[in-house]
Structure formats: C-alpha cells, structure tokens
Amino acid sequence: MKKFAFLFCAVAAVLFLAACESSPKGYSVVDGVIVFDAPARAEGQHSVLRLTTDPMPVVRVGFIGLGMRGPGAVERFTYLDGVEIKALCDLYPDRVEKSQEILAGRNLPAAAAYSGEEGWKELCRRDDIDLVYICTPWQLHVPMAVYAMEHGKHVAVEVPAAMSLEECWQLVNTAEKTQRHCMMLENCVYDFFELTTLNMACLLYTSPSPRDRS
C-alpha cells in the first residue's frame, strides 16, 4: 500500500511538472515557492496569501445555515478550547432551536438566535463576532461571505465557496480589501496524498537538475 501511494504521488508530481512546462509561463519561483501571476490589484489592495492577524485568546463564532452540515459544525466547535459560539442563524427558527439544544447538551450558554431571510445580516453586523461560519445553499455562499468580510468578520465557508470564476475573484478582492481571512472548508486539500504530491512537485521543480549538479 505504501509503495502504491509513493508511486501515485510520484506520477502525479511528474504530470504536474509536465503540465507546467508545456503551458505558457504564468508563474515565477520566489524563495522556493511557485507564485502564479495574478491580475493587477487596485491601489491599497494587498494579497492575503500570508495574512496574519493578532492572536485571539477566544474566537467568537457565528453560524449561518443549520440545516444539513451546520449542526455538525456547531457540535464540533463545542469541543474546541478558546471558542465561544455567540450566534446561530437559519431561515427556519426550529433549526436554530435544535442547535441551541446541542449547546445546552454540552452545558454551554445559549447563543443569540436569528432567523428569517434577513437574519444572517443582523448576525454579521454584531460587534462581538470574529468568525462567521457559512453552511448555507451554494448560491448564498459568496454574498454572505462578502457581507461578513465587509463587516469586519473572518469567514469560513463550506464547499463550494463560489460557483463561477467571477465569484472566486469577488471573494479574493473582498478579502484583500478588508484584510480578512476567507477559508473554504475543504479538508482534502490538506490530506496526506495532496500535501505529499505538492511537496514533491515543489522539490523537483526547485532542485537543480542532474545536469546542473555535474
């Protein structure tokens, strides 16, 4: 199994490099990191790829969307230290109540409750929330994430974060203008195979070729 995994990663890395070599150059290597070309940014707008924020002893979270993945996310957060669940929101009030029961079952205080079509905006406008966690239908991800960032909140959004290239850039531009984190919650990006393949590709691409070593 380990041999198969290694071969799989090696082949994937080679294919990745071949694709890079065969395509028009749209990247550069800076300090061993492949940096892809990107459109010019508006004045005062800066990349958030290496954005850092001041440490937060307690991260205050508000959840939007409690129908399918939302309740599971709420429950997982109840097991985390340094987290306070401050607000819960869904179109339907009964879903909010069910998530309140999750908090009660963990002996945690009830969160502020929001419902209806505009409740999520009220949640985003609160001044005691650091992170907005979005678990709503796909077409609502971008408008909610943008609104939250524009109101000073960091954002975690379920997959897919956006439904078009234009929407992707809308998220990027808003994150850069507001200097707020916007993370798509795709855990497979950080799995063993993906990270191993990426590291192998970077290592192969940035290491001297056998010809250069001689």
Report each predicted region and the residues it spans.
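Bacterial N-terminal signal peptides
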Residues: 8-16
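N-terminal Rossmann-like dinucleotide-binding module
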Residues: 21-106
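Basic phosphate/pyrophosphate-binding loop/patch that engages nucleotide-derived ligands
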Residues: 174-179, 196-204
